[in-house]
Amino acid sequence: MDRSSKRRQVKPLAASLLEALDYDSSDDSDFKVGDASDSEGSGNGSEDPSKDSGEGSCSDSEENILEEELNEDIQVKEEQLKNSTEEIMPSDKQLIKMEKKEEEENGERPRKKKEKEKEKEKEREKDKEKATVSDSAAASAAGTTPATSPPAVTSPSVPTTTTTTTEEQVSEPKKWNLRRNRPLLDFVSMEELNAMDDYDSEDDNDWRPTVVKRKGRSASQKEGSDGDNEDDDDEGSGSEEDENDEGNDEDHSSPASEAGGKKKRSKVLSRNSADDEELTNDSLTLSQSKSNEDSLILEKSQNWSSQKMDHILICCVCLGDNSEDADEIIQCDNCGITVHEGCYGVDGESDSIMSSASENSTEPWFCDACKCGVSPSCELCPNQDGIFKETDAGRWVHIVCALYVPGVAFGDIDKLRPVTLTEMNYSKYGAKECSFCEDPRFARTGVCISCDAGMCRAYFHVTCAQKEGLLSEAAAEEDIADPFFAYCKQHADRLDRKWKRKNYLALQSYCKMSLQEREKQLSPEAQARINARLQQYRAKAELARSTRPQAWVPREKLPRPLTSSASAIRKLMRKAELMGISTDIFPVDNSDTSSSVDGRRKHKQPALTADFVNYYFERNMRMIQIQENMAEQKNIKDKLENEQEKLHVEYNKLCESLEELQNLNGKLRSEGQGIWALLGRITGQKLNVPAILRAPKERKPSKKEGGTQKTSALPTVLYSCGICKKNHDQHLLLLCDTCKLHYHLGCLDPPLTRMPRKTKNSYWQCSECDQAGSSDMEAEMAMETLPDGTKRSRRQIKEPVKFVPQDVPPEPKKIPIRNTRTRGRKRSFVPEEEKHEERVPRERRQRQSVLQKKPKAEDLRTECSTCKGTGDNENLVRCDECRLCYHFGCLDPPLKKSPKQTGYGWICQECDSSSSKEDENEAEKKNASQELSMEQKTPKK
């Protein structure tokens, strides 16, 4: 009887538990529903009902203890559930991904919606019937669990021994488990994820909320039976089904709790400890998976940020890379060009919603050229890259050209459109030549601007200057009428030019790769949307162009050179290419169009004017005359060459006969002198030798002749080249002022195209002599160890004084060694016994050997001979003749730099005047001797 009475108290105990929990079957939001892990006791009890009936005879004290422990256990679990829910809620995305992985591993497919609804209705009917049966059984005195109750799903810690079929598991009701940490995944979690700082909606490409399945356990734990999986699938169908399922769990949990109350205290404690371990394992796995998910999100964000940093947007107008909210750098979705909103005149309210404004932007942006569907050519420069603006006449110009070229105006200053070119003077087209254009055929196209530094005469195109980083803009704080200015390379800031040049190169490389990368990144739907939007813009632009009023143009048609249009030049070059005409063989003559000797203009710019037409026909007539004249001159040249060959033969014969006569004359002169001396001895008087018997007077060579003695009295009529040893093309022979040899212009190394310019203070030397000077300098620099190293060596390399060592005084009456000759005029002479030496070509090896024997002394310049002031090698120059030093400013006229140039020598003004006086004195003496000889010849006749 006692046992039966105790057994009857199970129902009030379960009711008291429900009242203590404030449970309401209509609202189960206070609980987190999961697997029936708490019904393990009932599951075990169902396996052995006799054991439950045997345990029903426990004392009242044991029941009270059990009730208190259950209450404490429930309170602890509620606190743990709240804490775990707060930790798990930010990781909804993680749980969803884990559920998706489990579904892929299990290979389960969701059932159709209709089948699920039918199964739900059947389960609800069964639940109602079982609820009524359980109520009636609880009211009766029976202490065992009903046989119709299905077996509970066991947790992984307690293995089950019952096996059920799939149909039984589908119809199996769910159990109420208080120890299951299972958060409710509703769509409120989407808002929480969006509120997170590191959340990006584009990273959730694999998240499909419509097919989300709610899991019963974490991915780290073992899955339950098939019945559990079916229950989980049912729970993912909607919020209403979740509430119904949780309500069913409540109905089926009451008999399980009653059966659990009949167990021993030891078994209850062991089960509680096992569940606690399970709970801690769940929390650990959830925390680990949450940390892994956070690391993955951080890695994705870093990769995305690094990818964005690799493509820093640069404005193609100002070459700046600062993008602010008030002035963003926008990118065209068609051509990929990037520009600031302010630099392009984009309206921030209507046009600034572009593809690069945000990662989730929906409105594409296009530049004006893409909207009109054209590939424009600038009217002001020959370059084709960059961003364009349309003029009021339908032409196109670079926006940077319109900003920097004077005379260009805008209809709307804020939007920088339309561009007006009629206010600019047409004479500027092709007036100046660009100094930066790589192709000289485009140097006079468009309009060139000048350097803004004072009186600088450098001219260049705007876009050519932009390539070199020479464009500048005044600060916004400065109130300047024209804030855009440009400098040449000489006057531009070096650091400013460096970073602008760097940004320009980066912009060019990015624009080439951006289109390919954007096509790869964009999906076909996004690309189709962009193309559709572009077609809409082009249709609007075509409509606006047809309805746009005509721009004002001057009444008189202004002529403009055809060569000033870059597009026309390209088309003409293309035409020449198709016709098979090479455009490289025609030199570009951009010289000034000055009049020729006969008063006719040599060249006129092509234009649609009557003046150019007259010039064109006149040029054709002149071309015919020139061709006829060339044919005549060619015939004359052939005749003269034949005559020259005959004359060369006669000349050689005459030279041979002249030498014979000179030898005979010398013999006769010596015989006459002997006879005349004999007559003097006979008479005993010293007789004057007649002029006819006198030898030709030996005279000193002038300084202009370089101090060399003539080897023969034979006049030199034809000169031979020192390299090819031929005497043709006498007009192309060039005299070296150092070695006194003649050279053809084409025989030199490197060949010359024209005669070098000589002045009174400078002269020219051949490459062989110049190489000798450079070898002298190398030997000198090898011996010197100067403190200022590089600067001193560079300066001395450029100095032309490098042939005669200063410590060796010139020796009179001796010819100096040719390998050590000076660049100045030589003062040494050849004695009479050595004057018949033949001139032998010099060899490099002998010269170098002599140089090694006689190294040149160090050239130290300390005092100016004019002002007697001190100086050094930086501000003094030494004369090659008198070896005196002069300040640059003490010369007449004063100079700012050294007058010496590489390959040329230099003498002071005094030496130049003295040499001219000596030449005059020698000429006077020669004339006097000729007059004396004439006087002596006349009385004999």
UniProtKB/Swiss-Prot annotation:
GO terms for cellular component: chromosome; cytoplasm; nucleus. A zinc finger (PHD-type) spans 312-373, 432-492, 718-772, 861-914. The modification Phosphotyrosine is found at Y199. The modification Phosphothreonine is found at T280. Residues 281-290, 930-941 have a biased composition (Polar residues). It comes from the Eukaryota. Residues 74-85, 94-109, 116-132, 829-843, 915-928 have a biased composition (Basic and acidic residues). Gene3D superfamilies: 2.30.30.1150, Zinc/RING finger domain, C3HC4 (zinc finger) (3.30.40.10). This is PHD finger protein 14.
